């Protein structure tokens, strides 16, 4: 059954989240609406989750879809009490089409957005993006932000076009959102025109995606938050089945 409405109006979290997160969630949903979406089935108990973290209520909303070119398109919205808002999004491609991985994360607190990262991460063995992506991204130019953040030790999975910043003002927030929209426009277009690869090339991109997921699972900050709220076993299951499931 095709998905024809990606409206986020049924989200209980959306109205309570940081404005930049709301803006970005709507932009992601709008870009996905142009693709032939079908539902992606998450484990039944992991679509909507409630827990407690250090006395605060933790709520997680997950939305997942798929297309012929993307095996899984995941948008997560989360809130911890009144102090922490989170957006997490990854588009996992089918290796058959040789596409990179789109990823975006926003973390916001009472003082505003503390971290914003977005990238089109390569799955080729040479760690380069396909030529068509490089051409389109180079034409965009590099946006300027005052506060660049340092990538984690496992950040070699990201491309040279990765943005990891702390926005200094509303103008920078809007600039970041626009760059994510640019990434998505390029990505969705390339997915539509992508041709199937050979078996050997498909295997190469499959291995690249496995490496990406394995590295992302090393994110100690995410794991610690989940472990505190739900325990180690639950956190491992969520990390490996919802956030970064390794393609079989």
Curated annotation (Swiss-Prot):
Instruction: Please name the source species.
Output: Synechocystis sp. (strain ATCC 27184 / PCC 6803 / Kazusa)
User: What's the protein here called?
Assistant: Phycocyanobilin:ferredoxin oxidoreductase
Picking any one GO molecular function of the record gives: phycocyanobilin:ferredoxin oxidoreductase activity
The record's comment on protein family reads: Belongs to the HY2 family.
Q: Which GO terms describe its biological process?
A: phytochromobilin biosynthetic process
Q: What does this protein do?
A: Catalyzes the four-electron reduction of biliverdin IX-alpha (2-electron reduction at both the A and D rings); the reaction proceeds via an isolatable 2-electron intermediate, 181,182-dihydrobiliverdin.
Q: Which PANTHER family does this entry report, sorted A to Z?
A: PHYTOCHROMOBILIN:FERREDOXIN OXIDOREDUCTASE, CHLOROPLASTIC
Listed A to Z, the keywords are: Oxidoreductase
Which reaction is the catalytic activity of this chain? (2R,3Z)-phycocyanobilin + 4 oxidized [2Fe-2S]-[ferredoxin] = biliverdin IXalpha + 4 reduced [2Fe-2S]-[ferredoxin] + 4 H(+)
Pfam families of this UniProt entry? Fe_bilin_red (PF05996)
EC number per UniProt: 1.3.7.5
Which top-rank group of organisms is this from?
Bacteria
Instruction: Check the record and name the InterPro entries matching this protein.
Output: Ferredoxin-dep_bilin_Rdtase, Ferredoxin_bilin_OxRdtase
């Amino acid at each position: 059954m095709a998905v024809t409405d990606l409206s986020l109006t049924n989200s209980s979290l959306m109205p309570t989240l940081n404005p930049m997160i709301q803006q970005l969630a709507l932009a992601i949903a709008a870009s996905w609406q142009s693709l032939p979406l079908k539902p992606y089935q998450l484990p039944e108990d992991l679509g909507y989750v409630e827990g407690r973290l250090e006395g605060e209520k933790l709520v997680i909303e997950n939305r997942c879809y798929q297309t012929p070119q993307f095996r899984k398109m995941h948008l997560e919205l989360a809130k911890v009490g009144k102090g922490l808002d989170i957006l997490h999004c990854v588009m996992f491609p089918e290796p058959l089409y040789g596409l990179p991985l789109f990823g975006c994360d926003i973390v916001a607190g009472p003082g505003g957005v503390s971290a914003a990262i977005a990238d089109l991460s390569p799955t080729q063995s040479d760690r380069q993006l396909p030529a068509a992506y490089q051409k389109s991204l180079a034409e965009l130019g590099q946006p300027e932000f005052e506060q660049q953040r340092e990538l984690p030790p496992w950040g070699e999975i990201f491309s040279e076009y990765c943005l990891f910043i702390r926005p200094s003002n509303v103008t920078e927030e809007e600039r970041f959102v626009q760059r994510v929209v640019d990434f998505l426009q390029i990505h969705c277009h390339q997915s539509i025109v992508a041709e199937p690869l050979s078996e050997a090339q498909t295997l190469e991109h499959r291995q690249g995606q496995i490496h990406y997921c394995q590295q992302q699972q090393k994110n100690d900050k995410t794991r610690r938050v989940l472990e505190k709220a739900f325990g180690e076993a639950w956190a491992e299951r969520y990390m490996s089945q919802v956030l970064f499931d390794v393609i079989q």
